[in-house]
Amino acid sequence: MVVDGDTIKIDSVKIRFSGIDAPESYYKGKEQFCFKGEEKISCGKLSKIFLIEKIGNEKVKCEIEAKTDRYKRKLGECFVKDKSLSRILVKNGYAFDYPRYSKKKYSIEQEYAKKNSLGLWSMKFEFPWDFRKNN
């Protein structure tokens, strides 16, 4: 089950994709929005929908790290058909390389999305970490 753009739930265990950050669907009662021209769009929902579509009915396999995040979620990288969901999200512009934690692991995918104005890079947005800091 997809919780949001960077978190899934498998057998009641929440797994946060480490090293990336997706827009917030709901954070402290607030939704994160992006703007395409005058149109106001829920960028958190866009990321979640993209992830749902990428997983489809396929089996998800995750490599779980030993540590958890501050919300007690497991951290890891998850795959569909041996393809990293984190890399897919970042390369298509629906999540961001989170340099604070990733050591720029996804920077090539992010540059590709940015250069090609894919996903959120085609809109005005606030990075999720800035949105949380400001709210």
Locations of the language-model features?
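Small beta-barrel nucleic-acid-binding modules, primarily SNase/OB-fold domains
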Residues: 1-135
